Structures are given as C-alpha cells and as structure tokens.
C-alpha cells in the first residue's frame, strides 16, 4: 500500500492542494509536492482533512512553504527525514518522529508536522479498495473504520 503510485501520502498532499505531487522515494514510498502556503495554513488544512486536532509542529508556523514531503505512519526516522531534506522540502509531515529528529528540526528551524500515526493513515481503506478493484472484476468490498484509539 505504501509503495503504490497513488499511495496515502500522495492522496493526502493532493487533498491539501499540493501540485506536481510525486512519490518521495523511487520505490513509490511517501510523497512530495509543491505548495505556496504558510506553514499555519497547511496545518489547518491537514487538521480539517484528517479530522484531528492533535497536530504537533516544530518550526515557525509563519514560514512560507514551497515544497512539502510526507510519509504516513511512522516515517519520522533518519532515512525518511534525510530524504525530505534532500528533495528540498521546506516541511516534512509524518505520523511519528524519533526524538532526535524533533531536536534536529528545532535546532535548525526546519518545519515538521506530526499528525499522529492513526490519523495519517485514515485513507488506507480507500487506497486498498482502489487496488483491489483494479485487479478483480467482481468483488464486494466492505469498509470498516474502527476509530482512533487515542480519541475514542
């Protein structure tokens, strides 16, 4: 699901208005896209899209963002953070971050957004649904949303 050309991160970035959205890694993992918004505007769009008020940020929320990168779920490790910076992203969004990544971002005034692991994968069912429909002509798909364990 993560290594799919229309993965969860690609869909999320498109939904907040990013243009020229492509995968972050060559294997189809993550996403990157162009925006022209303040960090705070992106935060509000993501908050509304994911129905999650528990978004945490690092960096100046008045900063103008031109390029955003995202990996849903637990993408806050060294490899993913380095890749976001390597492609020139001004903002990196994920569901979880390692503590030392947060500290590095704070020290360098790099913009990070932590949206929560569950919230970042809200569109999983839709992506899986689309993949299955591409491969099976006759299939009935039943979707089930269990809810965020942190918020009830």
Explain the meaning of each model-derived region:
Residues 1-152:
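Active-site catalytic microenvironments in core metabolic enzymes, especially phosphate/sugar-handling
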């Amino acid at each position: 699901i993560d290594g799919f050309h229309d993965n969860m991160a690609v869909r999320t970035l498109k939904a907040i208005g990013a243009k020229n959205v492509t995968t972050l890694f060559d294997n189809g993992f993550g996403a990157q896209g162009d925006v022209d918004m303040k960090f705070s505007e992106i935060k509000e769009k993501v908050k509304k899209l994911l129905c999650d008020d528990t978004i945490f940020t690092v960096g100046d929320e008045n900063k103008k963002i031109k390029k955003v990168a995202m990996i849903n779920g637990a993408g806050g490790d060294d490899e993913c953070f380095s890749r976001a910076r390597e492609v020139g992203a001004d903002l990196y969004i994920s569901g979880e971050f390692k503590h030392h990544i947060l500290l590095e971002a704070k020290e360098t005034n790099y913009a990070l957004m932590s949206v929560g692991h569950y919230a970042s994968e809200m569109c999983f069912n839709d992506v899986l649904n689309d993949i299955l429909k591409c491969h099976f002509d006759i299939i009935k798909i039943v979707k089930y949303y269990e809810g965020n364990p942190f918020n009830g």
